[in-house]
């Protein structure tokens, strides 16, 4: 079983989602997790770290150090489900190929539309001539992240369907 599949299966069984997996130099394995309904607290990271340590040992995975953390305020958007979940939130999107000479866009995500397998995501942004709409598929994206919203009053992120 591929490492990402092994970790994702383990996390799903625990009620968590694998956001991102990184293999860094010197044997460092970084796992970013989320829990759509409640978010992540330090106890979640500890619990997942203990479980993954056992699973990786049993599966004889070669690594020196394991880090488990939340995806952070600037969470990456990797899957179609991420775009659905964070519709209404502000995001930075970098496309693989330019559209009208531009690859980088910042705006408000719209809920994906279209038939299964051909869904288009919308991003409302401020263009040169006023408000504009960019439509793209998840495969068109080089990288996408939420724009951090820091609210010291404890309100939820706008668009987060939690």
UniProtKB/Swiss-Prot annotation:
Instruction: Kindly state a single biological-process term from the GO annotations of this entry.
Output: translation
Pfam families (UniProt xref): DUF150_C, RimP_N
Q: Which UniProt keywords apply?
A: Cytoplasm, Ribosome biogenesis
Superkingdom assignment? Bacteria
Which InterPro entries does UniProt cross-reference here? Answer: Ribosome_maturation_RimP, RimP_C, RimP_C_sf, RimP_N, RimP_N_sf
A GO cellular component term found in this entry reads: cytosol
Q: Where in the cell is the protein located?
A: Cytoplasm
The keyword Repeat appears for this protein: no
What this chain does, per the entry, is described as: Required for maturation of 30S ribosomal subunits.
For this chain, the family text in UniProt reads:
Belongs to the RimP family.
Spell out the protein name for this chain. Ribosome maturation factor RimP
Q: Could you tell me which species this protein originates from?
A: Cupriavidus pinatubonensis (strain JMP 134 / LMG 1197) (Cupriavidus necator (strain JMP 134))
Q: Which gene encodes it?
A: rimP
């Amino acid at each position: 079983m591929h490492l990402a599949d092994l970790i994702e299966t383990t996390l799903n069984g625990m009620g968590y989602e694998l956001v991102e997996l990184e293999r860094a130099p010197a044997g460092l394995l970084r796992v970013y997790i989320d829990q759509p309904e409640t978010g992540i607290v330090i106890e979640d990271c500890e619990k997942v770290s203990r479980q993954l340590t056992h699973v990786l040992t049993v599966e004889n995975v070669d690594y020196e150090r394991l880090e488990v953390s939340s995806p952070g305020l600037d969470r990456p958007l990797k899957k179609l489900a991420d775009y659905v979940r964070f519709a209404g939130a502000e995001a930075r999107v970098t496309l693989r190929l330019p559209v009208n000479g531009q690859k980088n866009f910042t705006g408000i995500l719209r809920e994906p539309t279209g038939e299964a397998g051909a869904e288009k995501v919308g991003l409302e942004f401020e263009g040169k001539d006023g408000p504009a709409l960019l439509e793209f598929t998840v495969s068109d994206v080089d990288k996408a992240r939420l724009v951090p919203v820091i609210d010291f009053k404890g309100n939820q992120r706008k668009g987060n369907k939690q």
